[in-house]
């Protein structure tokens, strides 16, 4: 090639190269200028436009400031607000407003972002978020898109949400509110793999949350707490100052349960939150409830079991240890008003699911064992008549032991007022037991089937005061104080042995004839019953209830009684036999003199043996009394005192001629009295026993059978006492013995 041609080519190519380099430089400078001054506005407009596009113009997104830093791969947004653009929104969109003070992204993987891969991000921090959701979407979108973690996969090293708050529901009556919250997460894998990773909780390796002032409303109840603290790495969940308040009277669903609950502290430790999310199984090492106070109004219909109520929350819950410290439990809205104070309890291996309630699970209230004690327990029996209380209760299901102390039942009205309240004669009761122990208590059977099975029950120093007023009609309904009444219990009651130790029974009676009150007592009562059961597999005529009791009548006369009966016998058959030791007949005067206007002038019993056979129709048997010098006086009542009268002296003389003054007779023959009298089902079994003894004794001393039977039967009743009637007063006679024990 000629030299002139080569020189021409070199000179013509150099200007083009310069121009290309110049253009490239200008383009680079323009790109850098656009990245510095144009990228941020473009991104801001793009975000705002994308929000309008995806919501079909129903929402407006505004971003007050947006700054990018490409070298540090960071992004900052400030003053972000999302608001509805129209008065109403489509039913496929929620109705909400959101305000965010700032959003900071750092360490964004730009290359992965451009390639459409999982974008790594070092940290994402949102500050001062306020989210108000007025309503959720009423129906799903017709063409639902893929989940966001599939559209925009991310991997965040650190995620933080600071000073968040908001409201859910209508502004006038929100369903949920949050005053302030701080949430953070580490190692967040926002991808399909992260969603299915069973070791992660909501895409993250760990979460930390502190919520202050959360408030929720459910079923008309308001639920709020001072703070909720959650840390998945430490497996911890804590709640401070939890309050649940019921709806106001007249509000809420009629017949639904109402709850009033407060608890200063609750701590759940060892919580496997990831297993809860992926398996629906709540597992934890311990749960401690500090000073929980629960008052609830039971629903009109029995609620479903606990596991079914909690099924939307978890399929199964396992907690190794549950501790309750200084709890309070009360049932309101019922006249009985039961309440438990100062409740302390520890449960082990708590499990809540459908299988744990079955009898084969051998659990007590979903737990393997319970150990605890309480303070005072109160309730009202036959409200408002009998407030009852138990001072302390001690429970150990593993040892099958229950101990109750200071059991008390106290009436609120007197015997005459009780008759007026019920409309017929009724016995007023006062009771106290120093201590009651149950050994071999099958708590698992009680929890599974509501059946009671106990090896031994012991009542220490029981005291019973029975006060009656004879003014009023007789209640002709069958008495429930009878062995055969056990047949009607729905649940099984099975006590292998029942012991009463050093008990006291006192009775007082005011007849219709005088305002004086007669008294009678049994001291040092010791009784043992075997096979107290209405379980058909335990109770039969071949295996009946048997028992023995000893005591001292009026503190003087030793008595011994043996009982045999089947609690499932439809005929109510009972066999009672016993004996009374030496005693003067005058010990009966404190009861007979003021109420029957009869007294024993003299007489000494060497011993009385009796045997009774009782069923639902008859009382039969024999009484054999050995006595001497028997004399009685018929008295009258005049001038507020019991005294001898002219007609009383005549009746006394005739009676002392008729009755046998001694037995054995002078010829050595021992006379036996027969018991033949109808059973009056409207009276208790104890009244039937007493009726048989009276009839047999009267016949034994010479009263004809028919007259003795008639005298032993109850009278037909009288009109009820008027509210202005003079109150009963104790009879003050020389025969009145001192009280064997003051009522507690």
Q: Where are the predicted features?
A:
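Flexible beta-edge/linker motif
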Residues: 60-138, 145-181, 186-242, 247-298, ...
